[in-house]
């Protein structure tokens, strides 16, 4: 760039000096004026000394700039930051308790954003407001529409693989299913009863029974009006963040990225219901979609004509009739995704129609027309109901429930407080939580316990005052009791079911020769011999199959315990008058099965569902009673109904876990009769439902069964061979041998176990382990899977770390002693663990709690001591699993000393037999150059070399011994007879040694034998050392002796086993390696380092010579030189080399002539 030169520099410099002086004078005058102002205002020395430069110069940066924190959750009160919101809350609670309300942060439920509650609320209204969502569609070339892509966030339980999209549901599942022992410490129930008793006519007083503060939290004394409200408080309140840490530790979050969802091309047709004109006395009411649909033949129609009856889920229980249609009748209760009390039920006639009973059926709605005798009572029922069936055109009353009468036309007059129920009400019973048939004990099928009640003959109205002063649940009227027409007093329960014609009474034995009292039957009905009231002394609880029943009414009494309910087919296939009794002997094909005999007929279907086998049981026969009109009972051939039992569950949890946890299906086909056992009351049923979710493996046949089916399977399949597991040696023994085994084998251990000491409970850290799955862990250091048997040996090999200090222990005794002496009384973890969410379960006294045991292992008594040790092991600070793994370590039982018998010892290599152990060991030393030993870490029998004491690992063969002897430095190198191995021994030995155990070679996969001297690609790629065969005169290294060795190794061995290197080849080396042949590895490494300084780029011949003379692998020598060259080149690039010349550089500057340095010998630096 061209610039005009400046002229008149002297003048410019003079003016510049003058201008500078003027500016100095102006500045000085300004400072003097400012000083006068400051003197007029004197705040005092206190403010002067307390003022810093940052106060008067805010525009300049004061102090060092704070480092940016990359973690999402940062504390504004200090420099703390974390990745987990819970850790930030714990930090605020611990260090900033006073300012915690200022720094309280909550996450957005729809996105990762988190901030203060006010900011999050504003953010939610701006970005996630529940406004009208405009569905965006994309149209492809064909004109088809696709919805936009959406991501679904799901949570999974690490304990049982239960998944849900709601975080609250997951926390509730984990608390109820896996941390149920913590519920009692939070849930509180007030037991104070209200003073006045509420009246039935006062609806307001009913609400006073359950006060709004009936439930409360034991931790923070918060009150709740219901269990759900209390559960919501416990799981969402900030006061219980410690509980959230425990629950969050077993919850895994997954983001499922779903692609474009294709729309359905054909819309499903809506289900239409045709309604009849309503009756004059019962106006129809519009209702939401029905939960039950019944189609049954009417009285005046043929069996092929069906009338559809719809029961709406409304509170009024109204029914709408549909016009009759011609169809076949069948009954199906099908599982659906509807809410509770919603399902569908239709009835047609087919052969054989299935009956499906699922967990979502709730039969608490009255249903018109015919009924099913095989039902499961579901839902809360406030009145006692019976197990019989009310006939058609029979009305029924209920006084314990307030309902609106007048919804259905009544065929008979009722009392003033009667509840009208349609003819042939579907039978109901006490609630058992779900309408599922489940097998709860061997040989029986649980249906649900229903308290029976009295029944009425067809066409008779229930009188209100039948049994004065007592309830009608017994079903028996005193002899001579007159039926009165009055209302039933409050507190009595009326029978809810009648007995259809041809149906046997499913409870209790009726002695013959008894007469039914007149208060139960109408005047035109008789009772044949063999039918008696229930109040006669009978203890069996089972109705005999040979006893027929009239179409009239039989009293049924409540069983004392859950009895056996029998379902039998119809007694006849003809038309019987209503007044004609059923004669004895009409049911001839019924047989009496003993308890448990039905499930002995387990027939495998050959199919599997997710690896679980399915079975088929014996058939069951169910009679569908068909009511008749005009005094005649038209009883057709009974349709045989196979019942499929589906797994039962409760609530949303079971509905969500059913798809992920399939259960074996038990199909019951038609049979003459079947026994059904009623389930116990509500508490026992809940326990049975919990047991149905557990799976057990049969120790005999190694099959997987649910816990309830497992009991049946053990009784049916293995009844003859009932085996018991010995808790000491973990072996199965028959029942008759188990007691003898315990007395003989473990007599000393049992006597000592009676004096059991208190177990030690410790917590430790194992950062090298990663918990993979049940009973299996992975060692990150060894990169291998560790089983339950090897777990403790592996832990002690790497060492267990103390949670309170950096100490590491390789024995359990040292860890126990260290915990007693150094950390006695310490209950809280260090900051490294607590900040990352690690927590240990402690009781009220501060002792460790072990809610379950993941591993049970055994250690020798000399390493463990006499006490059992419970270990809670954390998988390191940086582990993703925050739940400790609980391990129980038991001392190895002292087995009674066995009497030494004279057993022959067999050599595993040459199959020679010896009578004494000394002769056996001498043979191994002289013949095979090995001696027996025990593996140091695995504690398993092994062999070691007698020359170098190295322990053989892996597959122990004669070929491996021969190869080792060629490489062994301590073994003699001559060709004497003691080092020669006979080829016949190698060829004839078909045994392999794996960790000292003799295993026949036939158990391993057999390879095709190749011709001698042939080397295939598989042999060349094999990583293991192959067998080596030597001849008697193998000194020359013939081809026969080297036939099993790879070609490259043969060449290298031939070169190394020949005569030593020549003098010419040694001249090619920069240094002589002959004196380092027998030196240690470090000395050889130092020689190679010196050789590298002389020649950093050795030739291939030099590398081979160094490898053969130093007895080092050639690849090791080459890699050593390459590594050193890389280090030097990297150092040259990063560091500037400097040379010290040996004289003063200041004096060198005075030298005016050139410097010439001559060549000199390089010295070793």
Swiss-Prot record:
GO cellular component: nucleus
Function (record text): May be involved in transcriptional regulation. May play a role in neuronal function; perhaps involved in protection of brain tissues from oxidative stress. May be involved in erythroid differentiation.
Homology family: Belongs to the krueppel C2H2-type zinc-finger protein family.
Alphabetically ordered keywords of this record: DNA-binding, Homeobox, Isopeptide bond, Metal-binding, Nucleus, Repeat, Transcription, Transcription regulation, Ubl conjugation, Zinc, Zinc-finger
Keyword Ubl conjugation set for record: yes
Zinc fingers (C2H2-type), renumbered ranges: 73-96, 106-128, 155-178, 215-240, 696-718, 724-746, 777-798, 800-823, 905-935
Subcellular location: Nucleus
Expression across tissues: Expressed widely, with the highest level in the brain.
Annotated CDD domains: homeodomain
Annotated protein name in UniProt: Activity-dependent neuroprotector homeobox protein 2
SUPFAM superfamilies the UniProt entry points to: Homeodomain-like
GO biological process: nervous system development
GO molecular function: DNA binding; zinc ion binding
Membrane spanning residue stretches: none
Biased composition (Basic and acidic residues): 1009-1024
Subunit composition and interactions: May interact with SMARCA4/BRG1.
Residues in cross-link Glycyl lysine isopeptide (Lys-Gly) (interchain with G-Cter in SUMO2): 146, 1009, 1048
Annotated region of DNA binding: 1090-1132
Keyword Nucleus assigned: yes
Region (Disordered): 303-327, 1005-1068
Biased composition annotated in UniProt, kind: Low complexity: 303-318
